[in-house]
């Protein structure tokens, strides 16, 4: 029997101009799906792009390509939730978690000093904990974790097991975190959304799993953050290739 072909479907939306020409980022998303699910996937991404609280886009690109390499299976991370009622408390929790993950305190502070600058980056930044410098060399583009998905039936079972809401934001965030933490040279990830209505963020690490923090910024704030803390011995190009190009499914057990 011929093996089914999977497709990577990716969407990005901006306002006033495409991203490369300085347009304001509105939304992005992606799926790994077979032909039978393409229409549903495209419709879902179209809806996501036009229903974002950052505004209505006037530029949208939906790109499709077939997957011509094996899809790697990655297990979901262990999960914990930290209830915080102020952004300051949430950020304090994040700092403590990063330290537990193995990031030296002075390097955590160094990264935080650059967060305003990193907020202008469309993707993630790679931060070297040995030098305290950004090493991805991608300027405002950053690194976009791509070509991953979490099959709906498996995600639903996971939410029931962990008493988590069946929320597409959680699905997307956890899928990204799981792929990021699967790379041997990445120690931890610090993230919160640029969505002004979404104040939750997380720290993810091999040692800690996915640590969700309920309030990391104030409502109405359009600045976001995504920092990958690396161990200093990383092959930068190989790491970026894995994050952007290696197709991955998040799966609780077995193979897809």
Curated annotation (Swiss-Prot):
Its cofactor is Mg(2+). It holds the Pfam family BioW. Disulfide bonds: none annotated. GO terms for biological process: biotin biosynthetic process. Keywords: ATP-binding, Biotin biosynthesis, Ligase, Magnesium, Nucleotide-binding. It comes from the Bacteria. The keyword rRNA processing does not apply. It catalyses: heptanedioate + ATP + CoA = 6-carboxyhexanoyl-CoA + AMP + diphosphate. InterPro entries: BioW. Pathway: Metabolic intermediate metabolism; pimeloyl-CoA biosynthesis; pimeloyl-CoA from pimelate: step 1/1. One of its GO terms (molecular function) is ATP binding. Its EC number is 6.2.1.14. Belongs to the BioW family. HAMAP family: BioW. Homodimer. Catalyzes the transformation of pimelate into pimeloyl-CoA with concomitant hydrolysis of ATP to AMP. This is 6-carboxyhexanoate--CoA ligase.
């Amino acid at each position: 029997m011929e093996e089914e072909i999977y497709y990577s479907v990716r969407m990005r939306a901006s306002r006033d101009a495409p991203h490369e020409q300085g347009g304001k980022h509105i939304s992005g998303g992606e799926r790994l799906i077979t032909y039978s699910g393409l229409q549903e996937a495209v419709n879902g991404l179209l809806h996501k792009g036009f229903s974002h609280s950052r505004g209505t886009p006037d530029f949208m690109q939906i790109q499709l390509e077939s997957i011509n390499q094996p899809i790697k299976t990655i297990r979901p991370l262990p999960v914990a939730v930290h209830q915080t009622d102020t952004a300051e408390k949430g950020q304090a929790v994040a700092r403590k978690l990063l330290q537990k993950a193995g990031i030296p305190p002075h390097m955590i502070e160094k990264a935080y000093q650059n967060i305003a600058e990193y907020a202008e980056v469309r993707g993630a930044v790679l931060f070297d904990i040995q030098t305290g410098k950004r090493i991805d060399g991608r300027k405002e583009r950053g690194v976009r974790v791509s070509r991953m998905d979490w099959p709906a039936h498996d995600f639903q079972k996971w939410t029931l097991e962990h008493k988590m809401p069946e929320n597409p934001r959680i699905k997307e965030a956890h899928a990204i975190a799981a792929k990021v933490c699967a790379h041997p040279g990445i120690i931890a990830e610090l993230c919160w959304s640029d969505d002004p209505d979404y104040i939750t963020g997380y720290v993810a690490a091999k040692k800690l799993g996915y640590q969700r923090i309920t309030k990391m910024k104030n409502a109405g704030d359009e600045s976001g953050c995504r920092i990958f803390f690396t161990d200093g011995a990383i092959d930068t190009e190989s790491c970026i290739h894995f994050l952007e190009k290696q197709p991955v499914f998040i799966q609780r057990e077995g193979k897809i």
